[in-house]
């Protein structure tokens, strides 16, 4: 009985995700990853020539500046990219 109770407690802790962690989409939005500590933004990177097709997605600490060839879109909520 104690083993069952301990197992339930562990499963509950894992499912509740103690401490806030940001989740960002990977390149294919069906999949996401949990961001490590310190990376509190999600980003989506586009080539300026093809703005509708993201090239890269993930977690980042500071939103990079856009350039003539590359545009970044950053946000700070779960799976916002």
UniProtKB/Swiss-Prot annotation:
Chief location bin: secreted
CDD domains associated with the record: TFP_snake_toxin (cd00206)
Expression tissues: Expressed by the venom gland.
S-S bridge residues: 24-42, 35-59, 63-74, 75-80
Biological process, per Gene Ontology: killing of cells of another organism
Keywords: Cardiotoxin, Cytolysis, Disulfide bond, Membrane, Secreted, Signal, Target cell membrane, Target membrane, Toxin
Compartment annotation: Secreted; Target cell membrane
An example molecular function term from Gene Ontology annotations: toxin activity
Record-linked InterPro entries: Cytotoxin_Cobra, Snake_3FTx, Snake_toxin-like_sf, Snake_toxin_con_site, Toxin_cobra-type
One annotated Gene Ontology cellular component of this protein: other organism cell membrane
Reported function: Shows cytolytic activity on many different cells by forming pore in lipid membranes. In vivo, increases heart rate or kills the animal by cardiac arrest. In addition, it binds to heparin with high affinity, interacts with Kv channel-interacting protein 1 (KCNIP1) in a calcium-independent manner, and binds to integrin alpha-V/beta-3 (ITGAV/ITGB3) with moderate affinity.
Family (UniProt): Belongs to the three-finger toxin family. Short-chain subfamily. Type IA cytotoxin sub-subfamily.
Assembly and oligomerization: Monomer in solution; Homodimer and oligomer in the presence of negatively charged lipids forming a pore with a size ranging between 20 and 30 Angstroms.
Protein name from the UniProt record: Cytotoxin 3a
């Amino acid at each position: 009985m104690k083993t069952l109770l301990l197992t339930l407690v562990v499963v509950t802790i894992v499912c509740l995700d103690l401490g806030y962690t940001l989740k960002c989409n990977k390149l294919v939005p069906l999949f996401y990853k949990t961001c490590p500590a310190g990376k509190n933004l999600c980003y989506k990177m586009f080539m300026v020539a093809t703005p509708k097709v993201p090239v890269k997605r993930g977690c980042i600490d500071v939103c990079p500046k856009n350039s003539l060839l590359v545009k970044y879109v950053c946000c700070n909520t779960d799976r916002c990219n």
